[in-house]
Structure formats: structure tokens, C-alpha cells
Design a protein with these regions (language model features):
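Short pre-active-site segment immediately N-terminal to the catalytic Zn-binding motif
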Residues: 66-72
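Non-catalytic beta-strand/loop surface segments
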Residues: 23-66, 90-126, 162-216, 240-287, ...
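M16/insulysin-pitrilysin zinc metalloprotease superfamily fold
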Residues: 86-90, 121-152, 303-304, 327-385
Length: 448
């Protein structure tokens, strides 16, 4: 199960270089056809019925992610995601695969800082068995030492492949730690090898007991089903799952303000060309500036016509690749711009131009054409997501996790379309120009 990074540097889809259209009236997007209720044990249920759909998407969103890793156990939430595919008291290992793949469906999972999500898509007439399986692993997961050792090995190899073997793996892994000094967002989702090796079966059982409970989960079902049938099946399978009487631990770290700009240097083996980055701390996804920051990010690096790509790659030939991301999570966020140098370009020069072009957004707001194009990119991406039951369910899930409100998925589209050039300039001044930043230079050398 891959670590899905709806996170740093991937938030704004750089491939969405859509043609500029003539200005048009704001789109009127129908709201999600949502029904919701809560079981007595605390499970939140969200139904998105679609009579025209032949499939259903079943998603369980647990409010536990990498920020909740126990002390000395970085990467544990992601490791646990893998373990959830092992057996339960009444369900052999790989049953989820049989219930999905054997009927032409699919399943997967992902872990990020704020949440762990298990999602499956099957033909609509196979919905109830999948609900039973999700309730079963919520209530009765059983993991033995062999399963823990096997999945730990898988995750360690994933870390080696994604971070150690990739020439720029250490570079991208370092960026969250530059934004935060004390908040657990500074840790990577995959964790550290030593911490993964230290995990025990007692850790597994305690983690499941603490976080994998109905009052810490949202069940989202979208597609072709009758809501009355869904309600009956959910009550049948999830209703008996007991919620512990203990409180759920929550991260309550207050990040101290950054007083000055900083510069860091990181060396790693097998780095073909230097890379540089600028990282700022940012507000969380529920902040009033979130939509304008998304637009600003897309203006800077949302495709080949974006400002950073035009200035650093196409016109000056200083970089082979550039990016900028607004990673706005539940508690706080990061803004990060990066560039990989073209051959012979000194990192210091590249860093200076990256900073100048990024901060130019605070002095030169977007033109009407720039703004219309970027709003079209972002709105189109959101509308494409809503074309499938799984996409609608995921949009709702992110609204719950990041903003605490399922209906925020609809408001987000209106907020994007309402962003003005003045809004973009204002947030660039507040969150980039006037904010403290950390500059990173990444070069070939022995790791420090």
C-alpha cells in the first residue's frame, strides 16, 4: 500500500497546463448529494448515493496519521496500515483482496500526516460483504510476530527505495523538518529504519486499541446503492463494534514562531546535480487564506506556462525542474519552492533567482488571463475528481479531515473561483515576503 502524498510539492498538479479560455461566469457546481448520520458507538456515516452508478466506493477514514506516531516509533501509523491487511478473528489474511479483486474491483490504502484511509471499489451488488470486512478488521484485528516482521521488512525496503536509493529522496524528505521545529509534522510518514525495527507486537495492539475505533472513524460510501439498505447493513456490521471509554490522544503542540531566516546545507551520495529549496511555515487548510494560497502555488508552478518554470527553466535555463507546493494540513501547513540545477549552474545563483521569482508575486499580482487560467486548472481538477464515486467520496473525506466539515468540499470550489489578483498579492506578501523562511542547498557528498 503506497504512501499517498497529498502533500508537499504534489498539492498543485503541475501537469494541468490547460489552454486559456475566455473569461466566463463562475461555474455553478451541484453540491454533493450527501446524507449522514452517527451510530451510538460514535461512527460517522456519510452516504453519497448515485442511482446511475454501477459501482460503489467504500472508504474508511481513521483520524490517525504520521503525526500520531508514538514516541520513538516514527513511521508506525504507516506500518500499521500494512498490518490491517492481515487476518482477524473471523477473516483470513487477504480476504479484502478476495472480496474486491475477485469480483472485478480494487482496494488500497494510504497514510499521510493527519489520516489513514482504506478504500475499495466493487460492483454495487457486492457492497455488504465489504462493509462486514471493514467492521471486522476495525473490531478484531489479529497480528502475529511473523506478520509484523514481514510488513516491517516491506516498509523498510520502501524507505530504502523512496528515500535512500533516489538521488533526491533525502532532499524531499528534509523539507517538512525545515518548516517545523517541534510539531510532529516535521517527521516523514515512512519513518526511520531504527524506529521501525524497534516496533513490537505490544505497540501494534496498543495502537489499534487507541485509534482504530468507531468514534475515531468516518465511513464514506458512494455510488449505486439504496440508502435504507446501507443504513441497515452499517448497523448490522458496525453497530456491535464497541467504542472504548478512554479518550483519544490528540496532538496539541504549539509551534513557536520563527524569529529569523535560516540557511541549511545537506549532502548525500549520488546527487547528479545540486538542488535548492525555500520553505515557509503556513496556516492550516481551514484558514481563510487557503484558497488564495492554492492559487498562488499554481501560478508559481502549475504547469509549463507557470512563472517559475518560465523564468528558471524555459527562459534562463538555470534549472532542469522546478516546483512549488502549498501543503495545508489540519494543524498547520508549509509553502515550499524547489529547483534542481541545470548543469554548471551554481546552487547559490539558482537559490537567489528562485527566491526573487517567488517573491515577485508579492510585487506583481497575476494578470486577468493568468488568474483565469489557474482558476480553471484547479476547478477542472476538482470537477474531474467528482466524476466517479471514489472521487466524490475522497473529496468529502478530505473536507472532513482538513476542515472538520463535510460540506466544505462544496464551499472549496466557490472559494477558489472567488480568489482575486489582490488576494494572491496579499497572501504572497503575508506568507512569503514578510514571513521567515529556511533555505536548503542539497549537494553531492557524504551524509552528515
Amino acid at each position: 500500500m503506497p504512501v499517498t502524498r497529498r502533500r508537499l510539492l504534489l498539492v498543485v498538479p503541475a501537469a494541468l497546463a490547460l489552454p486559456t479560455l475566455a473569461p466566463a461566469a463562475a461555474l455553478r457546481v451541484p453540491p454533493l448529494a450527501l446524507q449522514s448520520w452517527r451510530l451510538p458507538n460514535g461512527l460517522q456515516v456519510y452516504a453519497l448515493p448515485d442511482a446511475a452508478a454501477a459501482t460503489v466506493s467504500v472508504q474508511v477514514w481513521y483520524r490517525v496519521g504520521a503525526k500520531d506516531d508514538p514516541p520513538g516509533r516514527s513511521g508506525f501509523a504507516h506500518l500499521f496500515e500494512h498490518l490491517m491487511y492481515k487476518g482477524t478473528r473471523h477473516m483470513p489474511a487477504e480476504t479484502i483482496d478476495r472480496l474486491t479483486e475477485d469480483v472485478g474491483g480494487q482496494n488500497n490504502a494510504f497514510t499521510v500526516d493527519d489520516v489513514t484511509v482504506y478504500h475499495s471499489e466493487v460492483p454495487a451488488n457486492h457492497l455488504e460483504p465489504l462493509l462486514w470486512a471493514e467492521a471486522e478488521r476495525m473490531a478484531h484485528l489479529e497480528v502475529d510476530q511473523a506478520s509484523l516482521d514481514s510488513e516491517r521488512h516491506v516498509v523498510v525496503e520502501e524507505y530504502r527505495e523512496r528515500v535512500l536509493a533516489d538521488p533526491y529522496g533525502r532532499f524531499f524528505e528534509a523539507l517538512p523538518a525545515l518548516a517545523f521545529d517541534v510539531h510532529p509534522y516535521r517527521r516523514g510518514v515512512i519513518g526511520r529504519i531504527d524506529d521501525l525495527r524497534a516496533a513490537t507486537l505490544d505497540d501494534v495492539r496498543a495502537f489499534h486499541r487507541t485509534y482504530y475505533r468507531p468514534d475515531n472513524a468516518a465511513l464514506i460510501v458512494a455510488g449505486g446503492f439504496d440508502v435504507a439498505d446501507l443504513a441497515r447493513w452499517v448497523q448490522r456490521h458496525f453497530g456491535p463494534v464497541e467504542a472504548p471509554g478512554t479518550p483519544i490522544p490528540r496532538v496539541a503542540v504549539v509551534e513557536p514562531p520563527r524569529r529569523r531566516d535560516e540557511a541549511r546545507r545537506l549532502a548525500a551520495p549520488h546527487v547528479p546535480l545540486p538542488a535548492v529549496a525555500l520553505v515557509w511555515r503556513a496556516p492550516g487548510a481551514a484558514h481563510r487564506d487557503a484558497a488564495a494560497l492554492q492559487v498562488a502555488s499554481a501560478l508559481l508552478a502549475g504547469g509549463h506556462s507557470s512563472r517559475l518554470h518560465a523564468a528558471l527553466v524555459r527562459e534562463r535555463h538555470l534549472a532542469n525542474a522546478v516546483g512549488f507546493g502549498a501543503d495545508l494540513r489540519a494543524d498547520a501547513g508549509t509553502l515550499a519552492g524547489w529547483a534542481i540545477a541545470a548543469g554548471g549552474v551554481p546552487p547559490a545563483r539558482l537559490l537567489g533567482v528562485l527566491a526573487a521569482e517567488t517573491l515577485r508575486l508579492a510585487e506583481k499580482p497575476p494578470s486577468a488571463a493568468e488568474l483565469a487560467k489557474v482558476r480553471a486548472q484547479l476547478t477542472t481538477a476538482a470537477l474531474v475528481e467528482r466524476e466517479t464515486p471514489a472521487g466524490r467520496a475522497e473529496a468529502l473525506g478530505w473536507a472532513l479531515v482538513l476542515r472538520g466539515d463535510a460540506h466544505a468540499a462544496d464551499r472549496a470550489l466557490d472559494e477558489l473561483q472567488a480568489v482575486t489578483a489582490a488576494d494572491v498579492q496579499r497572501v504572497a506578501r503575508e506568507h512569503l515576503l514578510r514571513a521567515r523562511r529556511v533555505a536548503l542547498t542539497y549537494v553531492q557528498g557524504a551524509p552528515g
